[in-house]
């Protein structure tokens, strides 16, 4: 009765310790599952709620499972006690009738084998217990190592996911800048049909990448990106409105230029009409004077040409102002791009702070583990104290045994019954040994299973590490290649822009020259018509007045011929220049067309490359997600296996405790039987001595008997 409260307290302490360990393990496993589920790209917003509910259900099941185990163990102990009571109740009723109530109680207490038979079993039992404790420690150490490795793998996966997110953000920003630049170029120089085709081909992968990125990113990062997108769209709208305003200004300037050209043509037509009217109404002397001084009329044309040059300079200054405004808009776009970069840097700093917080959490976990170790040490010290108290109780019990040994002298007649009971106990011992051997074989098979599982996990961890290193190398190489290609393409685009600007200026100059040449041709034709008219008049006058003006007519004819030759030479020169300008314009147009085709082909190739890169990244992400799911399933299996092993360890511990109690009872009964045997032997010796003394007295009396009748006689 003195040992029952101590055993109950020990069982309670062990149960509390096991519960604390299980709670700690369940928390760590829950944290691992949460960390694995955070980097998943394909999971939506409803999935975390489901995972949370399942984790809560698992925690409830885990907390309820030890209670079920304890109730099952209690039921097993009750069944064992009932079986023992049934076995003891199978004793023959005839013997029970012969035995007194005191003898029956003492018989139940002494129903155990001798000390010599139980020494071997006790030694084997202690060795077996030590072996099981060592195996349990080894399993716990391996489990802790596996947990640490899994934490390392989880941290590495988080780092890879952050790198992928940053790369996607950079790629989206670059694509946006390229699309904006290409849109401006197409709006200014390329036709609307080609612009629409290229725009559609360039926008499709961009929208597709945005969709993939939105699916992959987490909720917080999506909100930040949406804010950035809103700000960027607002800035784009402002810049587009400015561009529209500038385009409207350009259209107005072009209209004014066309109006001025029409006014010039009208004025030139009026001037030509005035000159024709004047020539028709002149007399001979005035006509001669104007023919001699025909160069005076060219001054008017030179003035008009100078005025047109001034207007051209004004238009060029207006174009320069428009270009400066375009440069300002480009600077604004660059400032907006820098602001977006700053926002991304801020987000990266936030992620860095997040990692710091995770490191602090890990440090707190380590401190909690240290505290748990300290509490375990305190438990060990308390257990040692209780062991000392148990030894004291054992000493007191031995004293009580000695006191009760004096009462066991009455059992000298039950030696035969004790021998029969010893035989029964030996049979039970043999059955217990067989059970222990079966348990040992089961434990050996389970050890083999555990070693196999550990080997598989190590192989899988090595494989995952190798694959991770290869993925990191490929990722770095791909990133360097893409950066180089983008820099080269940016340089080429800048060169092409400069060449386009130069060709545009050259085209404008050539167009202006061609317009001037055409105007000069028209003027020369008008002058030729006038000269022919004058020649016709002079010929008519020549017939009437040949004698008076023959000399003057010859001089005028010579002057006219010289003038005609000069005009023909000028016309030929202008036609040659015009042909040259047309050829140059044709070459420029062909070069521009080839350049535009090359640009289109490069854009198509870049779009294809971007699609290939996106497909590769998606396939890599899918592979990583599959590997993560496989590791997650493997973790679940290992957790189940661990729980089963813990349950088996608990059951084995309870069985060992029952066996220890049984062995203690056997020790008590063996010591009591040994004392009884010693007492019986001493009593037998006393009886033998008394028998010898009685036999001696009988012999002495027999010797005395024959002498008694002689004396009577």
From Swiss-Prot:
GO annotation, biological process: cell projection organization; centrosome cycle; establishment of cell polarity; microtubule organizing center organization; neuron migration; regulation of cilium assembly; tube formation
InterPro entries attached to this UniProt entry: SDCCAG8
Modified residues (Phosphoserine): 4, 28
Compositional bias annotation for Basic and acidic residues: 201-212
Region (Disordered): 84-103, 194-215
Illness association: Senior-Loken syndrome 7: A renal-retinal disorder characterized by progressive wasting of the filtering unit of the kidney (nephronophthisis), with or without medullary cystic renal disease, and progressive eye disease. Typically this disorder becomes apparent during the first year of life. Bardet-Biedl syndrome 16: A syndrome characterized by usually severe pigmentary retinopathy, early-onset obesity, polydactyly, hypogenitalism, renal malformation and intellectual disability. Secondary features include diabetes mellitus, hypertension and congenital heart disease. Bardet-Biedl syndrome inheritance is autosomal recessive, but three mutated alleles (two at one locus, and a third at a second locus) may be required for clinical manifestation of some forms of the disease.
Subunit relationships: Homodimer. Interacts with OFD1; the interaction is direct. Interacts with FAM161A. Interacts with RABEP2, ERC1 and CEP131.
Protein's UniProt name: Serologically defined colon cancer antigen 8
Organism: Homo sapiens (Human)
Higher taxonomy: Eukaryota, Metazoa, Chordata, Craniata, Vertebrata
């Amino acid at each position: 009765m003195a040992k029952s409260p101590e055993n109950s307290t020990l069982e309670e302490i062990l149960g509390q310790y096991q519960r604390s360990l299980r709670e700690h393990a369940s928390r760590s496993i829950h944290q691992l599952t949460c960390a694995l589920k955070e980097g998943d790209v394909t999971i939506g917003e409803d999935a975390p709620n489901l995972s949370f509910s399942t984790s809560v259900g698992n925690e409830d099941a885990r907390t309820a499972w030890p209670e079920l185990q304890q109730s099952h163990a209690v039921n097993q102990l009750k069944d064992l006690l009932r079986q023992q009571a049934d076995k003891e109740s199978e004793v023959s009723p005839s013997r029970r009738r012969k035995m007194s109530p005191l003898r029956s109680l003492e018989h139940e207490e002494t129903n155990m084998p001798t000390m010599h038979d139980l020494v071997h079993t006790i030694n084997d039992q202690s060795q077996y217990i030590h072996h099981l404790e060592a195996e349990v420690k080894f399993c716990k150490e391996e489990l802790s190592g596996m947990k640490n490795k899994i934490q390392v793998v989880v941290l590495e996966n988080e780092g890879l996911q952050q790198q992928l997110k940053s790369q996607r953000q950079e790629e989206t920003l670059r694509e946006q800048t390229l699309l904006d630049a290409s849109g401006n170029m197409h709006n200014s120089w390329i036709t609307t049909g080609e612009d629409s085709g290229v725009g559609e081909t360039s926008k499709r992968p961009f929208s597709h990448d945005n969709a993939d990125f939105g699916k992959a990113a987490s909720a917080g990062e999506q909100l930040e990106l949406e804010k950035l997108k809103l700000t960027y769209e607002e800035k784009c709208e402002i810049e587009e409105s400015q561009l529209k305003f500038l385009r409207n200004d350009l259209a107005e300037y072009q209209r004014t230029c066309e109006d001025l050209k029409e006014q010039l043509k009208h004025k030139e037509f009026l001037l030509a009409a005035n000159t024709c009217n004047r020539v028709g109404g002149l007399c001979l002397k005035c006509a001669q004077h104007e023919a001699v001084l025909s160069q005076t009329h060219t001054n008017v044309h030179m003035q008009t040409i100078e005025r047109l040059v001034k207007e051209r300079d004004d238009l060029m200054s207006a174009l320069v102002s428009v270009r400066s405004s375009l440069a300002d808009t480009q600077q604004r776009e660059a400032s907006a791009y820098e602001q977006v970069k700053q926002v991304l840097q801020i987000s990266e700093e936030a992620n860095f702070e997040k990692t710091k917080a995770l490191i602090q959490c890990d440090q707190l976990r380590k401190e909690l583990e240290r505290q748990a170790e300290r509490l375990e040490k305190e438990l060990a010290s308390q257990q040692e104290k209780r062991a000392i108290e148990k030894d004291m109780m054992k000493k007191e019990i031995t004293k009580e045994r000695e006191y009760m040994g004096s009462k066991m002298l009455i059992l000298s007649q039950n030696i035969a019954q004790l021998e029969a009971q010893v035989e029964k106990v030996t049979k039970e011992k043999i059955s217990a040994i067989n059970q222990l051997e079966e348990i040992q074989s089961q434990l050996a098979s389970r050890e083999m299973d555990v070693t196999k599982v550990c080997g598989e996990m190590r192989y899988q961890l090595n494989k995952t590490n190798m694959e991770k290193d290869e993925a990191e190398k490929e990722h770095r190489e791909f990133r360097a290649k893409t950066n180089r290609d983008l820099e080269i393409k940016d340089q080429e685009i800048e060169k092409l822009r400069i060449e386009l600007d130069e060709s545009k200026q050259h085209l404008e100059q050539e167009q202006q020259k061609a317009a001037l040449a055409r105007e000069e041709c028209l003027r020369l034709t008008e002058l030729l018509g006038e000269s022919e008219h004058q020649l016709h008049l002079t010929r008519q006058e020549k017939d009437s007045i040949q004698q008076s003006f023959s000399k003057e007519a010859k001089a005028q004819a010579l002057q006219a011929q010289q003038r005609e030759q000069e005009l023909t030479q000028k016309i030929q020169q202008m036609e040659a220049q015009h042909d040259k300008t047309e050829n140059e314009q044709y070459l420029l147009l062909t070069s521009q067309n080839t350049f535009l085709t090359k640009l289109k082909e490069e854009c198509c190739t870049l779009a294809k490359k971007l699609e290939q890169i996106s497909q590769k990244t998606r396939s890599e992400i899918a592979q990583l997600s599959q590997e993560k799911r496989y590791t997650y399933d493997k973790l679940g299996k290992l957790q189940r296996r661990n729980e089963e092993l813990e349950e088996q360890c608990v059951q084995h511990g309870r069985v060992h405790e029952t066996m220890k109690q049984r062995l203690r009872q056997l020790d008590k009964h063996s010591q009591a039987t040994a004392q009884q045997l010693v007492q019986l032997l001493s009593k037998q010796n006393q009886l033998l001595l008394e028998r010898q003394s009685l036999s001696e007295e009988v012999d002495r009396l027999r010797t005395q008997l024959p002498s008694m009748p002689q004396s009577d006689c």
